Amino acid sequence: RGVFAGGWSPNVVNIIDYITTATLGNAVDFGDMTEAKYSMSGSMSSKTRMVIGGGHRNPSPAVNTIEYWEFATTGNGTDFGDLSAAKSSGGQCSNAHGGL
């Protein structure tokens, strides 16, 4: 699955959509993020879980929240914890064992 979350359309949204990468087609509703935000600090994933952190609410500044969801089933984001500082538009990376 490919997953898309948050954004601005025309207001900040909390929508999570997904596509099945093996087939052509439109995005389908996956669930909702824990809050509406945009410009998240990237994402990282394992084979089973996707994690995103940071971002912006409107109109407030950057946030420090981290949330995750499981690829196998559709559903809403779940609180994972907090970043050490509020930030947005950063980068993250991961391998099969952990993320930075």
Residue ranges, per PLM feature:
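Polar, enzyme-active/binding microenvironments
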Residues: 1-100
